A protein has these predicted regions:
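Short juxtamembrane and helix-loop transition motifs at transmembrane-helix boundaries
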Residues: 52-65
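Extended, low-polarity transmembrane helix blocks
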Residues: 2-51, 68-159
Length: 159
């Protein structure tokens, strides 16, 4: 049976239909997904850390709760937790934390239902991008870190 014929059949490892178009690169694709998902958070987490007072001001302007604490939580989620995803350490727990964090940022930072015009379009764009990112983290929770990860290296997860 060719690889294309096997598409749609159950994948023995994940139980999902056709986990990859080309079998054998699942772990490489999971690594790429982890790195891509983490990139946004690492870039903006570093920015938030470098301008902590600006981060607090932005949260205050958005009407976020406890801006000083919220800024610290944002930096924690976007730097060490996203870094854990990137290297595949505590991947499932980190992915779930980032799902919850991203839901919070969507609901606090992108309330498109409270604005009109161009602001509404921008907020709606951010809101639905956040939902899409949440979907990526949920998939990462389901698949796990893959072979190229600290989780596998330390025996936390099977390859």
């Amino acid at each position: 049976m060719t690889q294309l014929q096997s598409l749609g059949r159950n994948d023995q490892r994940t139980g999902s239909e056709g986990s990859a178009v080309i079998k054998g690169i699942d772990d490489e694709l999971i690594l790429a997904a982890r790195l891509l998902l983490a990139t946004l958070f690492l870039i903006f987490g570093w920015r938030k850390l470098r301008d902590y007072s600006g981060t607090v001001s932005q949260i205050l302007q958005l009407g976020g709760p406890m801006p000083v604490l919220a800024a610290a939580v944002a930096i924690f989620m976007e730097l060490p937790v996203a870094f854990a995803v990137a290297i595949g350490a505590f991947t499932r727990a980190s992915a779930l934390l980032l799902v919850l964090y991203t839901l919070g940022t969507a609901l606090i930072g992108h309330r498109y239902w409270t604005v009109t015009g161009a602001d509404q379009v921008d907020s709606m764009d951010g809101f639905y991008k956040d939902l899409s990112i949440m979907g990526g983290f949920l998939l990462l929770y389901i698949t796990g870190a893959g072979k190229y990860s600290i989780d596998v290296l330390c025996g936390i997860a099977a390859p």
